[in-house]
Structures are given as structure tokens and as C-alpha cells.
């Protein structure tokens, strides 16, 4: 590959793929459970994405990048972790940034913020207890906002499986939170 096409690929990659870097980081954070591992996963995933960028026709850059990051996360976790242990240390910060982009904070009082933090903490703990396949589907749908078809594309399972995993994940969350409230 000559220098001109390499620069063109870089510019095209930056335009099409890099806008979804925050989504990739959020997914990696939920799958890995901590900032350090998520950064490693996203870095490796972006390198893989760039290396394969010219070889594919990409109709949905977001789903394409998330698929690569997901696969990188599974490979990375398989090499670097001996168990299914998920540590949660800084996902609250990531989720707060996501929430700040989506919502307004006009009528937030210290009391409602404290309640929301406690509720968010319970929800986060319940999500981390979900089996990885359920957690992944839930994060892709409810945090990343992907539709069923896109989730099926990212996870390489049928749409029916995505729907089933989401349903079961939500049932388990409701059950876990209800049990915690008692």
C-alpha cells in the first residue's frame, strides 16, 4: 500500500469509525469491569479495526467497531483472566458521562442525586452479576441503544437469541433488585 492510500484510509477511518470510540469504551468497560482493562481492549480493538479497515465494505461503522471490540474483549479476557470475575471500579463515571449527554440536570437536588446514586449502584451491581451473554445484550441495547438486528450482528447470534437474552437479563435484574429491596 502506498503512502497516499494509507493517509486516505486513515482519514476515512477517523471519519467513519472514531466517532464511536466512546461506545466502544463503554462496551469494553462493561465486559471487562474496569477502566484499565477497557482501555487495553479498546486500544487493541482499534488497532485490529484499522488493520482490517480497507478489506471490508462497512455499512454500519458503529456495529462493525463494536463487533471488533467485543471479539477483542473476549480474546483479551481469555488470555488475561483465569475466571469470569468482573471487577467494578469506575463504571459509574462512564455511565454518568453517558447520562449527562442524554438527560438534563435541571431539578436535581442533593437528596435526589444521593438516591439516584444508591439506585444506580444497586443496578450496576445487579448488572455485573448477570451472566456475560445477558450482560452484553443488555448493555448493547439499553446503554448503547443498538436495535435487535444490530445486537445480533455484533454478537453473531440470531435476533431471537438476542430477544431471549434481553428478556432473561431483565427478569434477572428485576428479581435481583426486588430481592435487594426486601
Annotated model-derived regions:
Residues 3, 11, 93-128:
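Acidic, proline/glycine-rich intrinsically disordered inter-domain spacer in sigma factors
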Residues 5, 125-136, 140-161:
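Helix-turn-helix DNA-binding module
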Residues 16, 20, 24, 45, ...:
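Residue-level preference for hydrophobic side chains embedded in well-ordered alpha helices
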Residues 40-47, 51, 59-71:
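Structural recognition of an alpha-helix C-terminal capping motif at a helix-to-coil junction
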Amino acid at each position: 500500500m502506498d503512502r497516499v492510500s494509507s493517509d486516505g484510509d486513515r482519514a476515512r477511518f477517523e471519519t467513519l469509525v472514531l466517532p464511536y470510540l466512546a461506545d466502544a469504551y463503554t462496551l469494553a468497560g462493561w465486559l471487562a469491569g474496569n477502566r484499565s482493562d477497557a482501555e487495553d481492549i479498546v486500544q487493541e480493538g482499534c488497532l485490529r479495526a484499522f488493520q482490517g479497515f480497507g478489506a471490508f465494505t462497512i455499512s454500519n461503522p458503529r456495529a462493525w467497531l463494536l463487533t471488533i471490540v467485543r471479539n477483542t474483549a473476549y480474546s483479551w479476557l481469555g488470555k488475561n483472566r483465569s475466571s469470569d470475575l468482573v471487577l467494578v471500579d469506575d463504571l459509574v463515571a462512564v455511565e454518568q458521562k453517558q447520562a449527562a449527554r442524554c438527560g438534563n440536570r435541571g431539578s436535581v437536588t442533593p437528596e435526589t442525586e444521593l438516591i439516584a446514586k444508591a439506585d444506580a449502584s444497586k443496578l450496576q451491581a445487579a448488572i455485573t452479576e448477570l451472566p456475560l451473554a445477558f450482560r452484553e445484550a443488555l448493555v448493547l441495547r439499553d446503554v448503547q441503544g443498538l436495535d435487535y438486528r444490530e445486537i445480533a450482528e455484533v454478537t453473531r447470534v440470531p435476533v431471537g437469541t438476542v430477544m431471549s437474552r434481553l428478556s432473561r437479563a431483565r427478569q434477572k435484574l428485576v428479581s435481583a433488585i426486588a430481592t435487594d429491596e426486601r
